[in-house]
Amino acid sequence: MRKILVTNALPYANGDLHLGHMLGYIQSDIWVRFQKLQGNQCIFVCGSDTHGTPIMLKAKSLGITPEELVTKYSNRHLQDFTDFEINFDNYHSTHNSLNKEIVEDIYNKLNNKNLISKKAIAQAYDPEAKMFLPDRFVKGTCPKCKAEDQYGDSCEVCGATYDPTELINPRSVISGQSPIQKNSEHFFFDLPALEKNIKDWIESNTLLQPEVANKLAEWFEQGLQSWDISRDAPYFGFAIPGTNEQKFFYVWLDAPMGYIASFKDYCNRNEIDFDDFWGDNSESELYHFIGKDIIYFHALFWPAILSSTGYKTPTSVFANGFLTVNGKKMSKSRGTFIQARTYLDNLEPSYLRYYFASRLTSRIDDIDLNLEEFVTKSNSDIVGKVVNIASRCAGFIYKKFDATLSGEIFDPELESEFSKNHDAITQAFEKREFAHAVRLIMALADKANQFIDYHKPWQLAKEEGQEQKVHQVCSQGINMFKVLIAYLKPIIPSIVAEAERFLNIQFISWADAPKFLINHKIDKFKPLATRIEKEKVDKILEDTKKMLENEQAPQSKKEEPKLDITAECTFDDFMKVDLRIAKITEASHVEGADKLLKLILDLGGVTKQVFAGIKSAYKPEDLIGKHTVMVANLAPRKMKFGMSEGMVLAAGDGKGIYILEPHEGAQPGMRVK
C-alpha cells in the first residue's frame, strides 16, 4: 500500500469559482479516487487562500471585515466543491492560528539560517489611495515581451517575473493613476543560495512534466533572484514578527503553508503521524496539483523553502492548462464565463466531469469546452453507450429470471477482452492520461453494444426455447456494464453510486473491476442518466449573461454635489491673510461654553490664545502636541471667555469637524503660501 498526500491549489476567497477553476479540481479528484480504489492510503487536502490586499479592499468596498468576506466565500467554495463531487478529506483556511504558527516557525528557521535579509527598495505607491501597491495592483506593459495589461509581478503571456518598477507605463489598479516610487524596507528570501537544493530536487523528480522542466531551465538561465516576502501595511495577513505590524508576510509565502496547516489539522483530528507523510525522511508520496500560472511559486520557491526547513519536498508538481469555451477565452459578454454554481443550477456534475476527463492528459494543454461537443459526447457516451447497455438487458433479467444473473459466461473471449484492458486502463489513470482511459473504456462500451445488437435479446425472447440464451446474453450485457461502470467510478461517482444500487454491489477494489458476477441478484433498473437538452446549455449562457448585466447595472444616480463657493477674491486680497504653522501646546475646556476649546498655540517663539469651536470633535488631551494651521494676522476678538488672537483652520460638512494638519517636517511659525 502506497502512502500518498495530495494537495490542490487553494482557491482565493474573494470571489466565486468558475468552470476554469473546476478543471484542475476535477482532475485531482479523479486521480485521488482512483488511488483510493487501488487500496492506497491517499489523503486529499485543500483550503481557502484568504490573505492579501485584494481581499482587504473588496471587504472595505462591501462595508464588511476581511474575515467576514473570506468566511462567506470559503463556505460558497466548499459547497461548490461538494456539489461537483470533489471529495476533499480536509478543507481548511490560511487564516487561523495553526497556519500562523507554521508560517512563523518556517520564517524563523529561514532567518536562523541567514536566508532572510532586509533592504530598502523603491515601491510603487499610489498617492491618491495613500498606500503602497502590491504587485497585482500595478498593471502595465511587460518589460520582457511587451505584452500590454500585465500584472506587476509576472506576465501571463511569456511567464516572465519582474519587479513592479520594471513595468512599462505602469498604472494603479485602484485609482488608475501612475504610481510614484517610494522607499520602504522589505524582507527578502535568498533563493539563489538554494539553487543547488532546487536542482537536486528537479534531478530526482522523474515525474516532472517536460513543460515544467523546460520552464525551470529557462528561469535558471535567466538567474534566480532573491524573493520579496513582505508587504507594507495596510495589509490583511500575518504580521512579520518584530515589525510592530508594519510589515506583513506576502500572501505567496503563507498560502502554500496552508497545505501544511490543512494536513496537520487533518492529522490532529485523525491521530495520523504528520512526519510519516511530510517529515524530511518520509517515504510517502507528496503531489501538488496546480494551474500552470503558479508553477513559479510551486516549483522554485516551495521546494527551496521545504528543503531548508526540515520538510519533505514534493514527489512532483502537476500543472494543468487553462479552460477556453468554444475555442475562445472565457468571456462574460458572450456568457461563457460560467460560474460553477450557474452550471450546477442547470446540469448534473457528472457530465462536465466526464467531458473534462475525456480531454485531460498529463500534458499542460489548455482544454476547450466546446458546448456543442459537450452535449453530443455526454449524450452519446454516458447515456447512449454505457447506461444504454443496462437499460437494454436489465428488464429481461428482472422479469424473466428472478432478477438473477446467469451462472455461466456466454462469451468467455469477450469477457477476457474486458479483463485484458484492465492493466492499460489502470496505467492511463495512474499517469493522469484520463483521455486515453476514457477512449479505452468507450471502445469496450462499443464492443458491448455490438454484442447486444448482434444477439438481439428482444427478438430471442419471442422465440420458443431461447430462454437460456436470452438469460446468458443479457447477463453478459449486465456484466460488461458492471465492468465499464467500475472503470468510470473515479470520473462519474454519483452515476456509479446509482449503478451500484441497481447491481447490488459496491465497487471498493479496483482489482475487482473486470470480474463478472455469477448467479448474482440485481435490483430493478431505473434510469441512471438523462440526455442533455440543448435548452439547458442555452440557459446556462443566458444566466451567465444576466449575471453580467446585474454586475454592470448602473447604480442609482446620486445627485452631483454642489459647492457653495463664496464670491471671488483677488490674489492681493488672499495674500493679506497670513497663514502660519502652529503647534498646540495647551488645550482645555472652556467653562460655560458648549462648543469651544481654549488653545494655546506656539508660532515659533510667539504664543497666541485661540478659542476654537471644535469641542464636539476633539478631546483637549488629544490635541496637545499636534501641529495645525492658523490665521495669524486676524484682528483679536474679545469674547466673554477671554481674548481670541486668531483662528484655527478646520473643515466640516455639518456632520464632523476636522482641523488641518500639515505633513511631517512643517515647523511652528512657517508661513503657508
UniProtKB/Swiss-Prot annotation:
GO terms for biological process: methionyl-tRNA aminoacylation. InterPro entries: aa-tRNA-synth_I_CS, Anticodon_Met, Met-tRNA-synth_bsu_C, Met-tRNA_ligase_1, Met-tRNA_synth, Methionyl/Leucyl_tRNA_Synth, MetRS_core, MetRS_Zn. ATP binds at K332. One of its GO terms (cellular component) is cytosol. Signal peptide: none annotated. It catalyses: tRNA(Met) + L-methionine + ATP = L-methionyl-tRNA(Met) + AMP + diphosphate. It comes from the Bacteria. This is Methionine--tRNA ligase.
